[in-house]
Amino acid sequence: LPPLLAAVGFALTLALFYLGLMDYDARHVYLDAQRGFYGDWQSPVMTLLWKLIDPLAPGPASMFLLIAALYWLGFALLAATLARRSLALACAVPLVALTPPLFVLVGVIWRDVLMAACWMVAMALVYAFHARERWLTAARIIALLLIVFGVLIRPNAIAAAPLLIGYALWPASFSWKRTLALVVPAMLVLVVTVRLVYYGALHAN
């Protein structure tokens, strides 16, 4: 039932917000994607992503669909995991996703929303498999990639990333002490990663 409610939420998102809302910044990124120009005023990684997915649904629709799918996937994973403990609590999760402070942003094509959706999936994935050792390593790897991707989308959110990395590494025994020890090295690695990807791989201007 909870995943079904999430699917209904996704359908409602499409009905209300399709094709998505583009502001000036998003339009700028989309036009750069069409030209194959990677500037660092916005995220060149988002520009590349949009260029890759645009043939699936040209225009704002491709990015809107990706954001909406990630948003509802994250809540569906969380709901399905909580259903093992409480069906009522699990059913409440998709309803939380529909509350105005969250839901009204799903249709807005902002890199902040894309980053948040990626991080939501990352945390929900690790939480879903934290007690399943067989799948936990794969869940960790995917989560860490999503966290790094979120930083590449929104570099000034880098300070929040070590907390998420800490949970991804130690979901069953999260420790503030270990996570705080991770802050400086994680941020240094992420700063270097951003520079290597932006200016080394994509030659952003």
Predicted regions mapped to residue ranges:
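Transmembrane-helix signature of polytopic, membrane-embedded enzymes
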Residues: 4, 78-100, 116-117, 135-140
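Extracytoplasmic catalytic/substrate-binding loops of multi-pass membrane glycan-assembly enzymes
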Residues: 16-29, 37-49, 53, 58-61
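Multi-pass, polyprenyl lipid-linked donor-dependent membrane glycosyltransferases
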Residues: 24-27, 63-70, 94-126, 149-160
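Transmembrane-helix motifs of polytopic, lipid-linked glycan transferases
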Residues: 65-86, 121
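Specific aromatic-rich, kink-prone transmembrane helix
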Residues: 77, 115-132, 142-143, 147, ...
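Short hydrophobic alpha-helices at membrane interfaces in multi-pass membrane enzymes
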Residues: 87-90, 130-148, 177-182
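Membrane-interface alpha helices of multi-pass inner-membrane proteins
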Residues: 139-154, 165, 186-191
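Juxtamembrane membrane-water interface segments immediately following transmembrane helices
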Residues: 178-205
